[in-house]
Every structure is written in structure tokens, then in C-alpha cells.
Amino acid sequence: MIRKLLILSICIPMFCGGQIFADECKPSGDLRYICGPVNAEDILPLGNTKWLITSGMNGQLINTHDKGHIYLVNRRDKTFEELFPGKKPVFRPDKKMFSACPAPIDPENFSAHGLALKQISTNRFHLYVTSHGEREAIEVFEIDAQGRKPTISWTGCVPLPDNMFSNSVAILADGGFVVTKFFDPKVPDSFNSIFEGKITGCIYEWHPGGRVKVIEGTELSGANGIAVSKDNKWVYVAASGTREIIRFNRTQSPVKLSRVRVSIQPDNIRWGDDGMLYTTGSNYVPPDECKSSDCNTGWSILRIDPETLKTIRVTGFDQTATLQKASTAIPVGNEIWIGTYSGDRIGYLPEP
């Protein structure tokens, strides 16, 4: 069904075309690449280690036959490898925590999209993944980075409603989560409606032992990236369809949304060590000005003050950069790492 949605008469810059195959891996100015990771839509650091985790979406959204992956990246020597499924995927189901999970993940039919990490002890983490494929679910893993190289095991899942194409997830203190509904795959033309600024999704919340529930009043156009404050009180969301950053207090009912308009189609939202939020996305161009399948618009990185929602453009690259369709930007050390949902590489550049 998703494939049918994407046979469009107009190429929407955020999602159409621009898939990069194995061409040269030369830098685009200050932007350097690690070539090989396919559709690495999201990137997160494993604490203070030298390791990064990236997602790897399957080809469902961009009409390719790519399979889903989770990648491990060494940010010091700039190498990567497949972490999951790998040669021998490990399954250690936590049936008490994830009692509604019907079966282990199918390593041949999943799509690792958005990521969230929670540290549970020294160099041990829970990883939550918005996943598509055989089922729409939050797939949960445990990563142990105490040894020479991190290991991963699948531990459970939380099935999501079947009228939901999820995008991003953020973990709450009790092991629950908030997750964005990007669009409804059961509604004809729901995906395209995002780019008309129409309501297509909202925010859901889940807690252990409970059900996945809508947070009323969070209806948005293309609810995409999501982040929560340290006290779990404030939620920040990227609304791609209306090109907005949203903030609300999840402890209040009904919620009241604060909004700020931005110049890009914002994707993932990530915290930096400086206490600021960072987002990236394709530079906005009206669809009727970008009709060809190879149309690229470049992308920009924005820094957002979580208190005022004031945004500042940090840097960006035009349509000539080899990496296009940027979906995540996260400062790690003295670098910013860039992911894309449509390509064969991740990028990194010195933090300006």
C-alpha cells in the first residue's frame, strides 16, 4: 500500500528521488562521508563511547528492495558494520515487560526507522526503534557496550495501531515512550496530504502494562521527530507538513501547543550537549517547482532554544552535495553527524 502512495505525479522534495548508489565517496566541502550504510535515517551516540548507532530503513518509502538494518559506527576511525540482524541475531524476550508482543522480530522483514536510547547502567542501553515491515511496532533491543565491541539482543516489542505509520520515538523514565504518527496508511492519499499541510497524525503514549493511547490535542501534519525534556515534562515535535517545531507540556490536559515556523521540512529532533535541540531537513521548495525525480533542494541544520523555540541556522549544503534528504543531525564531540533516509552513506562535519 505504501508503494502505491508514492507513485506521485509531482516529486515532493522531502521524499522523492535522490537515492545515491555506490558512486565516489569524496567529500562535499567540509562534509565527509562514511559510505555503505543504507537509508541510515537516524543516528545516536552510545553514551561517551566511540560508537554510534544508526538505523537502516528498508526500501518501502523509496520503492527499492533494501532490507532493514541497524548499523554500528566507529566515529573515531570512521568505519561501520551491520549490528542487527548480523550473522546470528540474538533474541532474549522480556515477556514481563512486553507481554503484548506476539513474537520475535523477523530479521528479514523489518525497517529500522527512528531510534531512542536509554542508558540502564555503565555502557548498557535500551534501544527503542520505530519499525515497519512485517508489523508496525516499537521494537526493543538491549545493547551492551562494555566489551571490545558492542553487542545487541532483541528483547521485545510494543505493537502499534494498524492505522499508523510511525516515525520517531522518545523513551520516558518508566520505560514507556511517546511516538509520532506520521500518516495513516489506511487512508487514501494520506501521505501526500502531509505536503498540503493537512492533519495526518498525532502523538501516542505508552507505559508498561498499559495500552498505546493518543495524546488528545496533538493532531499535526506529518508528525515526525520527537524529543522529551530530562524531566519528561516537555515534548518537542517536528511537524514536517506545516514546517513547524511544536512544544507542549505532556502533564497538562488538554495540551496546549506552542509553534514556530521554520524554513526546512524538519525531520528528527536531537538534544545536543549544549542543552539545545538540533534538527535538519530538506530546504523547502514548493512541489510545483521541484517536479523531476532527481530534484534535490539541499538541506540545513537548525539549532533550537528549548525555552523560546528561537531557531538559528547552524550550517547546510546545497543540492550539489552527494548526501541529500538529510533526516538527522546530532552533535557528538566536535563533530555533527548527518543521516539520510535515502542514500548509501552517512556524513560528518566539524561543528561550526
Regions found by a protein language model. Give the residues of each.
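Loop/turn-rich, solvent-exposed surfaces of beta-rich toroidal or solenoidal domains
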Residues: 263-316
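Blade-level signature of beta-propeller repeat domains, shared across WD40, Kelch, NHL, RCC1
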Residues: 325-352
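A short helix->beta-strand "capping" segment at the edge of beta-propeller domains
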Residues: 23-39, 152, 312-317
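Beta-rich, blade/repeat-based domains predominating
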Residues: 37-48, 65, 89-119, 154, ...
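Beta-propeller domains
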Residues: 53-91
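Beta-propeller blade signature
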Residues: 67-76, 137-145, 197-207, 296-307
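Short, conserved, GDST-rich strand-edge loop motifs in beta-rich repeat architectures
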Residues: 54-68, 129-130, 179-198, 279-297
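Short loop/turn segments immediately following beta-strands, especially the blade-tip
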Residues: 142-150, 249-252, 306-308, 350-352
